[in-house]
Amino acid sequence: NAWDTNVDVWHRRMIEASEEEIFQAAQRTHTPYNHVYLRKNTKLEELAKYPVLFYSHPTIMTQERADLLKAYVEQGGTLIIGCRSGYKKENGQCVMLPQPGLLQPLTGSDVREFTFASPAEPAVYARWEDGMESEMPIYHDVMEIAQGAENAKVLAYYTGSFYAGRPAVIEKKTGKGRTIHYGSTFSRANVKQLL
């Protein structure tokens, strides 16, 4: 994913914004924060010490990495991913699977459309069941619950643009943990809400 950030202009725009905003939210809420780089030899024990993992925009996904993340969630972790996740192989080619590709069994989401947020339109938010709204900056995954996904539910719906009323945030429980597919980039405000 580091390679892809350097080459893919779309990905760079999202990852740079999200990483800065996750850091700022953690600092301002006094939430302990650490960077973990997933390598081929990363073990579950290394991830298990973190109750929450933000894997903001993992465009490149391997089966080994997806299996590691699944094991992390099954043992009780919370995995939060953002938009444009899991749609490429290690060689940079798109997978021939619905987005988020190899992560779909974990997320229970099916990305049906995707788009940059239009500067010509009013800002789009996600509205949660309790009426709270979250910022949805830069990019939007327009999702639905994947066919056959068990223990998945929509947490929030888009409020604007042509996809108003469509799922913006989907949660899926797996084992003792859960995965949240947040269909946008991260901001200080929405990270604070997720924490």
Segments (PLM) and residue ranges:
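A conserved amphipathic helix/loop scaffold
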Residues: 45-48, 56-195
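Aromatic-Pro/Gly-enriched surface loop or interdomain linker
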Residues: 1-50, 106, 172-173
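Conserved, mostly hydrophobic/aromatic
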Residues: 53
